[in-house]
From Swiss-Prot:
Binding sites annotated in the UniProt record for [4Fe-4S] cluster: 348, 413, 416
Keyword 4Fe-4S: yes
Keyword Lyase: yes
UniProt source species: Parvibaculum lavamentivorans (strain DS-1 / DSM 13023 / NCIMB 13966)
Protein name (record): 3-isopropylmalate dehydratase large subunit
Length: 473
């Protein structure tokens, strides 16, 4: 057999049959379901008098519309409340496990899956959400699907797919001070653009990737979709096994030993051929930040706002000018002088315990210097799950954030997207640890800059973007 990539191996292991048109029918091992993209799918099953084919391989959790403030009052918005209630009823009717809002395990679906050991190497994982790519951090082939596909997977536990091409991105060099997993993925998207991965599954490799914790790897894979690819993969290793061992839905005993032996066969063969390879050296990079309305609008925190006049391509210059107008920015302005109104720390990109610890380090540094969140800034920390929140509170992180002037919230997608009560007002500028900075993403007229958790805290204290490496000096 010819050398194969990790993607090739997982595809081959799950291929039921190939059609004459070149598409393949893949078996799906895990299906994550949330309240926004599942109602029509379940209703389709009802109308066709079908059942969920493998309820034990399906896990449901509400995250997009849930409130992050006092939940004893329920969900104020009627549409959001109906969506959450509908998910609960559908889960009950079809025998699917549902983690309700009062469950300590509830949270953002892409944080809950790994926490529960539902996410495993070598599996195929789908969800009606584009950031399903997060689970690729475990060496799983994971990607988002549409509502009609959600119904198809519920009914058959299979999915019709066209095989993608293979891309490998090698991230080399030791991460310098202040440079995090979020900065790595921003560097990648800044390099390849939002269409650079179109048609590919990306495998992330190299020293910098291997050095990352599992939380950091999830951050990188999470934003694969922002680089244009449908799925991202990182080869499983000892860090992967250590993270998963003992998780509620991970294999136990002899089954665990057998699973690990299989997982060790997943990494790409040494001579495997990739359709495209890219190398990015991060050794001398400062922290990064987005300036515009696309995740590819990435600059260094030491840079100035770019000028469309410096761009030769007229269409590119026009899109830059539109972004500048929307963002209310002037070319040539140092990005570290741009003032902010809001800070959001959370999301499926940066809402894990490691992210909150990194943020708390900077917040505690501010407290010791007699400082707190600037009076002109409203800042919130939203844990990615109830278990993350519980762990953070055990470590006293909530007290640090509260003392520093941050709001400490309940878990959920929150301000990552304008589908719940946490939104930006028109014209408000936000330092956000989420994954998208599109026009209106966090609220109509809201202006989003993507940064790491540490950078977000530093901006909250200063009242403007700042180089976290110099914070407090």
């Amino acid at each position: 057999m010819a050398p194969r990539t990790m993607y090739d191996k997982i595809w081959d292991a799950h291929l039921v049959e190939m059609a004459e048109d070149g598409t393949g029918l893949l078996y799906i091992d895990r299906h994550l379901v949330h309240e926004v993209t599942s109602p029509q799918a379940f209703e389709g099953l009802r109308m066709a008098k079908r059942q969920v084919h493998a309820p034990q391989k399906t896990l449901a959790v509400a995250d997009h519309n849930v409130p992050t403030t006092d939940r004893s009052k329920g969900i104020a918005d009627e549409e959001s409340r109906i969506q959450v209630e509908t998910l609960e009823h559908n889960a009950q009717d079809f025998g699917v496990e549902y983690l309700q809002m009062s469950d300590i395990r509830q949270g953002i679906v892409h944080i809950v899956g790994p926490e529960q050991g539902f996410t495993l190497p070598g599996t195929t994982i789908v969800c009606g959400d584009s950031h399903t790519s997060t689970h690729g951090a475990f060496g799983a082939l994971a990607h988002g699907i549409g509502t009609s596909e959600v119904e198809h997977v519920l009914a058959t536990q299979t999915l019709i797919q066209s095989k993608a091409k293979n891309m490998r991105i090698n991230v080399v060099g030791k991460a310098p001070e202040g440079f995090t997993a979020k900065d790595i993925v921003l560097a990648i998207i800044g390099e390849i653009g939002t269409a650079g991965g179109t048609g590919y599954v990306i495998e992330y490799a190299g020293e910098a990737i291997r050095d990352l914790s599992m939380e950091g790897r999830m951050t990188v894979c999470n934003m694969t979709i922002e680089g244009g690819a449908r799925a991202g993969l990182i080869a499983p290793d000892d860090k992967t096994y250590a993270y998963l061992e003992g998780r509620p839905r991970a294999p136990k005993g002899k089954a665990w030993e057998m699973a690990v032996e299989y997982w060790k066969t997943l990494p790409s063969d040494p001579d495997a051929k990739f359709d495209k390879e890219i190398t990015i050296d991060i050794a001398n990079l400062p922290p990064l930040i987005t300036w515009g309305t696309s995740p590819e609008n990435v600059i260094k925190i030491t840079d100035r706002i770019p000028d469309p006049k410096d761009v030769a391509d007229p269409s590119h210059a026009k899109s830059m000018q539109r972004a500048l107008d929307y963002m209310g920015l002037t070319p040539g302005t140092p990005i570290n002088e741009v003032k902010i109104d809001r800070v959001f720390i959370g999301s499926c990109t940066n809402g894990r315990i490691e992210d909150l610890r990194a943020a708390a380090v900077i917040a505690e540094k501010a407290i010791k210097a007699g400082r707190k969140v600037a009076s002109t800034v409203n800042a919130m920390v939203v844990p990615g799950s109830g278990l993350v929140k519980e762990q953070a509170e055990k470590e006293g992180l909530d007290k640090i954030f509260l003392e520093a002037g941050f709001e400490w919230r309940e878990p959920g997608c929150s301000m990552c997207l304008a589908m719940n009560a946490d939104k930006l007002a028109p014209g408000e500028r936000c330092a956000s640890t989420s994954n998208r900075n599109f026009e209106g993403r966090q609220g109509r007229g809201g202006r989003t800059h993507l940064v790491s958790p540490a950078m977000a805290v530093a901006a909250a204290i200063e009242g403007h973007f700042t180089d976290v490496r110099e914070f407090g000096n």
